[in-house]
Amino acid sequence: MNRPLGLGHFTFLHLSPAELVRLARGAGFDFVGMRFNPVSPGALNWLPDAAGLAELDRVMRGEGVGLYDVETVIIDATLDPAALVPMMEAAARLGGQRINTCADRFDGLVDRFAGICDLANGYGLGVDLECMAWRGLNTPADCLALLRDSGAGNAGYLVDALHHTRCGGAPADLSAVPAHYLRSAQLCDAPKEAPADLDGLLAEARGGRLLPDEGGLPLAEILAALPEDIVLSVELPSATDERPDLERARAIHAATVALMARARP
């Protein structure tokens, strides 16, 4: 399977966007995702100012590495969709295609999500919804229900291999999802047995992910259940892998390409 592969910013979040682009190019990746929105107030994000955006655009063109998605938007009762406009403008300027989100439960969630999708559509962007065990929408069925209820034509279900599995999803479930919801997938491995509590799940997601075939997630089965044209990226933050960035990125790329070839020869 010879197809484009992306590198998610969360894998090397200490790198600036330009550094990430250069690393991706050196390791063989075709595109990147970028952290342009903080996961909580004051948390790290790399949204550039106007001058930084122009420079990043220049670097991306020079390296031949594109932007696919930007993250992370937590949709809760406090979120003002207008606050997302700078992120959307930057993503559109750089040729991005999708925004990654997750959501909590609150009155008006469906309308809020639909409004964000409508706002994103004005910038030529789609919105992917990710299942996370510690958020209000913590099963794949919950996420798919919101997509359906919103009626948004640019909405999708982000198949993160770790989150989908830890939230109770199975590879077979993906075969039943309407194909127009399956735009993007993020790959990594992890131990077969899930952590015992939410603190453990958080720690695993944020720093305990493994290279493909180092763990026990059903990665080949997940890939086999996905549409042929789904966009594949790697999201693999690790708190223990101390290899130099380029060495680690190349190892991640090689392991993921081998997985893809085995799953869909």
Question: What do these predicted regions represent?
Answer:
Residues 8-12, 35-39, 72-75, 103-106, ...:
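Active-site beta-loop-alpha junctions enriched in small/polar residues
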Residues 71, 102, 211-213:
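The substrate-binding groove and active-site-proximal loops of carbohydrate-active enzymes
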Residues 1-6, 14-31, 57, 61, ...:
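Histidine-acidic metal/acid-base catalytic patches
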Residues 1-6, 66-73:
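N-terminal small/glycine-rich loop or linker at the start of catalytic domains
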Residues 46-53, 77, 81-84, 106, ...:
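Flexible, glycine- and charge-enriched loops at secondary-structure boundaries
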Residues 32-34, 68-70, 99-101, 127, ...:
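Hydrophobic residues within beta-strands of alpha/beta enzymes
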Residues 59-66, 74-156, 166, 263-264:
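Active-site acidic/histidine proton-transfer and metal-coordination neighborhood
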